[in-house]
From Swiss-Prot:
It catalyses: 4 Fe(2+) + O2 + 4 H(+) = 4 Fe(3+) + 2 H2O. Keywords: Heme biosynthesis, Ion transport, Iron, Iron storage, Iron transport, Lipid metabolism, Mitochondrion, Oxidoreductase, Steroid metabolism, Steroidogenesis, Transit peptide, Transport. Monomer (probable predominant form). Oligomer. Interacts with IscU. Component of the mitochondrial core iron-sulfur cluster (ISC) assembly complex at least composed of the cysteine desulfurase Nfs1, the scaffold protein IscU, the accessory protein bcn92/Isd11/Lyrm4, and probably fh/frataxin. This is Frataxin homolog, mitochondrial. It holds the Pfam family Frataxin_Cyay. Its EC number is 1.16.3.1. Gene3D superfamilies: Frataxin/CyaY. The lineage of its organism: Eukaryota, Metazoa, Ecdysozoa, Arthropoda, Hexapoda. It is an enzyme of class 1 (oxidoreductase). The keyword Iron applies. Belongs to the frataxin family.
Amino acid sequence: MFAGRLMVRSIVGRACLATMGRWSKPQAHASQVILPSTPAIAAVAIQCEEFTANRRLFSSQIETESTLDGATYERVCSDTLDALCDYFEELTENASELQGTDVAYSDGVLTVNLGGQHGTYVINRQTPNKQIWLSSPTSGPKRYDFVGTVAAGRWIYKHSGQSLHELLQQEIPGILKSQSVDFLRLPYCS
């Protein structure tokens, strides 16, 4: 299934990153070289000088801890999706330049087809994660967490800090050029 494994070991002041073959034996110390038991499988060991234990080895993320209980999440999520559905229906009804548009909302899934040239947006609830997921033909998939209070909260993509409504405000006006678009006036975008 996988040709190799990735192993990271850290020792005070040093780290060793190695790709090991399937039958390689783990190294005892970071300074040792990994020798595969099968000659066809190569191994690479890289010594990393001046490794800092406090260094973040992943992308920076914005804190988005949701404090909503289940019932509040359901209400906030439903209010958000209902408002988006109503607004998309209003926008597509007034969009004379778009052919074949359709807006459908059922069982927590909002599907907005903006025609063959522009694609389909899918916005849906993810109750187990207390998230709203977006699939955009322009920017791809994103997962939004609710941040803030019910009175002053918004749905945030934790990797960029951009809200759901900000992303829609960025993408949709480029499609609906003949009318003004303002997603930032909808609930839960403050």
